[in-house]
Amino acid sequence: MSDNSFGKLFRVTTWGESHGPAIGCVIDGCPPRLKLSEEDIQPWLDRRRPGQSRFTTQRREPDQVRILSGVFEGQTTGTPISLMIENTDQRSKDYGDIATRYRPGHADIAYDMKYGIRDYRGGGRSSARETAMRVAAGAVARVLLRTLVGEGVKIRAALTGIGGQTIDPSRWDWDEVERNPLWCPDAESVGPWEALLDSIRKDGSSIGATVEVVAEGLPAGLGAPVYGKLDADLAGAMMGINGVKGVEIGDGFAVAALRGEQNADPIAPGPQFASNHAGGILGGISTGQPIVARFAIKPTSSILTPVPSITRDGESVEVMTKGRHDPCIGIRAVPVAEAMMACVLADHLLRDHAQCGWGR
Amino acid sequence: MSDNSFGKLFRVTTWGESHGPAIGCVIDGCPPRLKLSEEDIQPWLDRRRPGQSRFTTQRREPDQVRILSGVFEGQTTGTPISLMIENTDQRSKDYGDIATRYRPGHADIAYDMKYGIRDYRGGGRSSARETAMRVAAGAVARVLLRTLVGEGVKIRAALTGIGGQTIDPSRWDWDEVERNPLWCPDAESVGPWEALLDSIRKDGSSIGATVEVVAEGLPAGLGAPVYGKLDADLAGAMMGINGVKGVEIGDGFAVAALRGEQNADPIAPGPQFASNHAGGILGGISTGQPIVARFAIKPTSSILTPVPSITRDGESVEVMTKGRHDPCIGIRAVPVAEAMMACVLADHLLRDHAQCGWGR
Amino acid sequence: MSDNSFGKLFRVTTWGESHGPAIGCVIDGCPPRLKLSEEDIQPWLDRRRPGQSRFTTQRREPDQVRILSGVFEGQTTGTPISLMIENTDQRSKDYGDIATRYRPGHADIAYDMKYGIRDYRGGGRSSARETAMRVAAGAVARVLLRTLVGEGVKIRAALTGIGGQTIDPSRWDWDEVERNPLWCPDAESVGPWEALLDSIRKDGSSIGATVEVVAEGLPAGLGAPVYGKLDADLAGAMMGINGVKGVEIGDGFAVAALRGEQNADPIAPGPQFASNHAGGILGGISTGQPIVARFAIKPTSSILTPVPSITRDGESVEVMTKGRHDPCIGIRAVPVAEAMMACVLADHLLRDHAQCGWGR
Amino acid sequence: MSDNSFGKLFRVTTWGESHGPAIGCVIDGCPPRLKLSEEDIQPWLDRRRPGQSRFTTQRREPDQVRILSGVFEGQTTGTPISLMIENTDQRSKDYGDIATRYRPGHADIAYDMKYGIRDYRGGGRSSARETAMRVAAGAVARVLLRTLVGEGVKIRAALTGIGGQTIDPSRWDWDEVERNPLWCPDAESVGPWEALLDSIRKDGSSIGATVEVVAEGLPAGLGAPVYGKLDADLAGAMMGINGVKGVEIGDGFAVAALRGEQNADPIAPGPQFASNHAGGILGGISTGQPIVARFAIKPTSSILTPVPSITRDGESVEVMTKGRHDPCIGIRAVPVAEAMMACVLADHLLRDHAQCGWGR
C-alpha cells in the first residue's frame, strides 16, 4: 500500500528508521530540466537539524543529503529523484529499556498493536527523524514552484504559540523568525518563551505549541472539488506531522462564532479580496490570496515524569524516558510545515496543469 | 484524476450537480456477501434530507436512493455498487442572477478561476447536495463495519456549538441528539439555539457551528505511519466537508497549552487507557479507544445582506442571495460527518486486513 | 479498491451488470470547456451495438446514453462526467440453468471462487455488455484528443483474422472496414469469413479472432519509463478486454526471430523513421509514429456443444449454453479496442501535460 | 506521478540510473513479521547478474544488495523496505559518443523527445540495470508468498525460443533450466543456441527471444474484474520489461484459430481442469491452475552494424554501438520475468485479502 507516500503527481515516498543505517526518499513525477543540486536542499535541512540550540534534541548529525538519481549535469531528468541521509549518531543504548515497555502518549503501543513488532530504537519509523526527508522533498518542491510559478513564491512558517502563550499578531515580523532559535515572529515573545522552555527542560517535561504556515505568490486555481480539495489535502498533510492534533485554514475554529456577513471576504475588481477569512481557499480551490494554515502540536511523550503504563507482556509499570529529546517538538515542526505546504502546492500545481492547463 | 473519489480500498466516487438530472456514487472495493438493500441506506438519507425543520433549506425532495449495481439477491457481489438519487425539485430560476456575479465567501469564483466555466445552477457541484451521496456511501460503510467488526460499532455525531455558544459537555446525552432538530446533545442548549437560529433566519443571515463525531467499538490497529495515518485521513475527510475550516482529533488545539504529563494518557493492563486526550489515535494508528474528531464549519455565504463583489466581467457589484438556504449548514453536516467517519474507518479496516490480517 | 477504474488522470470507473437496471461509468479528470454532448458519444455506441448483423448477439437494445453530470450548456465543466445506459432487453429467463452450473471457459467459476457469490444473469459483471461503457468513455477521450491535439488524430481498429485465417495486409483498406459487418479491412476476406461464421453459428459453436488497432496523429512523448510505459498500459488495457489472451505492440512476437539490424527502425532528420517495427513506441514513450497494437481473442465459451463441467455443489454435469450469443466476440471487440486505445492515449496526454508541459 | 512504481498494495518504487552512484527500490505495504534478510535476496540477484557467461554483458559488478530499512531483528516491521545496490563498474567512457546521437531502436530519442534531457551514460534509466531492483523486489515477494500461501508456491521462467528457433515442449525439464547458462528447459536446444549466440556475438549483432513464466501453487481467487484483472496486470508487467513487444496468457495468440469447444477447459469435481488453455485465469481471476505467461523480446539495439540515424541537432549520421552488451537480452529477462510474476501475485494476494478475506 502507498502508506509511505504523499502527493499524486509530485509523489514523495519516504523510508527509514531513526537508528537504521540511513533515511531517504524518492520523488517521482518531478518535471525535467529544473536546476537542482544538493546545495538547493542542504540549507533547508540545516535549518531543521537538531542540536542547534538548547531547545532541540542534542542528537548531533550533519544530515548531509545525497542525490542518488534523477539529476544529470545539474538538471532534473524527469526520472525519480532518490535522496538519502546516512544516520551517523545512533546512540541506541539510550533506548534499551524502551524495548519492553510502552511510553504513554507515544506511538509505540499502537505500532505493536498493529504490526506485532516494532523497531524500538529511537522510535524507529515514528521518530521525528523521518521528517528530515519531508524537508528535503520540500526543498525540491520549492525549486519546482520557483521555476514554474516564479520567484515571487514564498512559503514560510512560524511558531505562534507555546504552552498556552500566543504571539501578538500585530507584532508579526518575518525577519524576526530567522533571528531567534524558536522561529517566533514576535520579538517580544522570544524572551518569555525561552524562559518557559528552560524551565520545562529542567523539569524533564515537554510542552505543546502552535505553528502557522503561509504561502504567497501562488496562482488561483490550485485544488479541486470535491475530494481533491486543496484545504483537505493541506489538512491531511499537517495532521500527518508527528504530534499534530488540530489544523485550521484561514479563520479556522473562529468561524464557528461568525455570521455570514462577517465571514465572507468582499471582492473587488482584480479580483482583489478585502480580507482573507478564507485563508486563500474557496470550495477547495486557491483564489490567489495568501494560503494560510495553522496547527497545534502536542507535547512530546518522552518525559522524565513517570506515568503509569504497561510492558509488552501486559504488566503494570511506570515509564519515564531518558535520552535526548526536544522539550517542544513544535519548534522543529516549523520547517517541516513549510516543506509539507511546498509539497502539497507542487503536487496541486502539476494536477492543475494536467487538467486545466491546456487552454491557458 | 481521482479528485472526486475518496478512500483507497473502500473507494467512493461521487458525481452530480445540484440541478442536474441526478446525483450518484460508485463504491468500488466493497466486500462480497454483505447483506445490503436500499432499506439500509434510505434511513440515513432521510436523516440528512432538507426540508424537515425550519432550520434547513426548504428544498423538498424525497431523496430516494436506488441501487443500480453490485447487489444481487440482497447481497453485495464484490462488484461496484452504483447508487443514484434523482433530482426532482430543481427550481433553477431562483439562481438566475447568480450566473453572472460571484457570491463573496462562495466557491463560484474559485471554480471559474480554475475551470473557466461553472454550472451555476444551485451551486452545481459545490452544492451541499453532493453530500447526500456521502451519506449513502456511509450507510454502506456502516454495513461493512457491522458485518466485519460487529454490532458494537457506533459512529455518531452531534452539533456542539453554534455562533460561539457551546454545549455543556457534562450534559452530553446521545439520546437527546435524536430528539431535537439540531442534533444537539445538550437538552438545555436546544431552546436558546433555536431562538438564535430563528433570529439569524429572520435577518437573512447565517451562522457558524462546531460538530463532534465519535466512533466506538473499532479495533486497534487501523491506520498506518507515516502518510497513511488515520488521523490525517480523518482530517482530510472532515476538512473536505463543505464549509469546514478547522479540524481536531482528541484534545485538538487544547494540546498547545499542555505539558507532556498532562497530555499522555496513562495505560493500564488490557490495555486500558485512563483518559483519551489522544482521541483514540497514537502515531496515526487506532488504539481501540473511542475515535474523536471535531470540526468548525463556517456560516454559509448565501445571505440576504449585500456584500461587495464583482461580475464575471470584473465589474463591481453588490451581491445578496435569494432562494432557499440553510441558516446553519453545520446542522446538516452532522450526518455527513458520521458518514465520512464510517467511510474512512471502512477503508482503513480493509487496508489493515490487506497488510496485517494474515497472521491474526 | 479501484479495480473497476482505469486511467490515472483521465480516469474511468464503470459499473453495472448485464441484467441489472442499467450500466454506467464516471469519467473523472476530463478537462473543462470541451464541447461535448450525447451526440458525440451515441454514434460510437451504435457501431458497437449488438443485433446489427447476424454475426452478433440478437439482443436488441437501443443503448441510448445519457449524460447525467459534468456537462453544462454543451461544455464539460471539469467535474465528473456520469454516463448511463438503461438495460431494456433483459430476457433473464434464458440464463436460468446457468445459475447452478459452470460454463467451461467462462468466468463464472472464477467469480464464485473469489466472491462466493455471482450475479449469474447474463454473465453479470463479466458480460461483454460492460464494454459499452468503455466505448462511451472512449468517445469522450476522442473529443479530448481532438480538442487538445488536433483533428489529425485517428484511432481505428479492424478485424485481421478469424479462425486461423488472416487478411492479406497488402489489401488493407480502412474504408472497407466501415463497409462490412465484420470490420474487416480486406474486401476479399469478407466473403469467406462470412461463410465461416455462418457455419460456426449453425454448429452452435464460436471462433477466435485477431484485431489490430492503430492510432495516428499523436505527439511524441506520451508514456514514461519504467512502470508508466505507454506500451505496458496498452497491453494491460487490451488484455483487459473480455476474452483477450495475447497482445502485441509493433512487430510483436515476430521480433523473437529478428536480429538487431532488422529490428531497429532507421532514423532520418525530422525525425522520420524509415520503418515502424517498434509500433510507435520506444522505451515506453511514443515517437510520433503510428501506434500499433494487436491482440488475439478467444472463442466465447457460450456454445451449444456439451462440455464436461460441475455444478456449484461440485457434482459432474455437462454444460451447453442456450440463448443469444456472438459466434465471434472478436467482431464487437473492434470498437472496444479503439475506445481503450483512445482512453489510454487521453490519459497519457494529460500525464505528459502534468510533468513535461511546463517548458513547451 | 507514480510512473516508477508498480503494484497497489505490494508497491514497489524503483530509482536509479545505470551509471549513477547506486540503484534502489522501496517496497511499501509488505506485511510485518516475515523473516527477511539480505540472504533471501542476494541469490536471486546473483542469478541475474551480468558477466557470468559469455552470453551476457561483461560488465562485472558484485550487485551486493543492502536492506536499509523496514527489517528489524530479522523480521519485516510493516514499514517501507528500502533496498540499494551501489554501482561499482561504471565505465562511462564507453558511451561518450552516444551523448549526441540516437541509436535506432533505442529509447534515447524517445526520452529526449519527452524530457528534453537524458542521462546518456549507459542508457541511464532505460538501462537493463534497473531490472536488478525488480529481481530484488521479486525476492521479497517470494518470501511473502511462501509465508502467506505456503512452500508449494513455485514461480519459474525459462528461455523458450531464440532467433526463430523454439524448444520442443515435450522435452521441457525445469532442472535443465538451472544447468545451462541460457535458462533453456530443453537440453537438446542448448548446443545449437550457444552456437547461434556465438555467431551473433561475433557479428556484433543481437537476436530476439521468447520467455515463458509459470506460477504454481497459488490459490484461486487472485485478480478481479474488470480493470483489476490478473492477466491484464501480468500483461502490463511483462510488457514493461525492457524490449518486450508481445505477451500471451495461456494459449495466447493460438486462440485466434480455435473453436469454442477446443478452447474451453473441461471441469471435473475438485475442481479439476482437464486442460489449461486459459493459462490459469478466467475472467481475470485465478482458478488455482498453473498461471502461464509468455513474451517475446526484441534484439537489443546496441549493435556494431551501422544504422542510419540523426544527432541531437537533427543531422544525419550512422550509428553503431561500441561497449559491452548482451547479444540476447532475453536471457537476462528470465529472472526478471519470474520476479515480476512474483510481485504481481503478491500484490493480488494482498488485494484479495483486503476485499474477500473476511469471510474465509
UniProtKB/Swiss-Prot annotation, chains A, B, C, D:
Task: Indicate whether NADP appears among the record's keywords.
Answer: yes
The prosthetic group or cofactor this protein requires is:
FMNH2
Pathway annotation from the record: Metabolic intermediate biosynthesis; chorismate biosynthesis; chorismate from D-erythrose 4-phosphate and phosphoenolpyruvate: step 7/7
Give the residues the record marks as binding FMN: R125, S126, S127, N242, G243, G283, K298, P299, T300, S301, S302, R324
Q: Which gene encodes it?
A: aroC
Say which domain of life the source belongs to.
Bacteria
Where NADP(+) binds, per the record, is at R48, R54
**Cited PANTHER family:** CHORISMATE SYNTHASE
The molecule here is called Chorismate synthase
Task: Cite the source lineage.
Answer: Bacteria, Pseudomonadati, Pseudomonadota, Alphaproteobacteria, Acetobacterales
Give EC number(s), comma-separated: 4.2.3.5
Q: How does it assemble?
A: Homotetramer.
Any one GO cellular component localisation term in the record: cytosol
| One annotated GO biological process | amino acid biosynthetic process
One GO MF annotation is: FMN binding
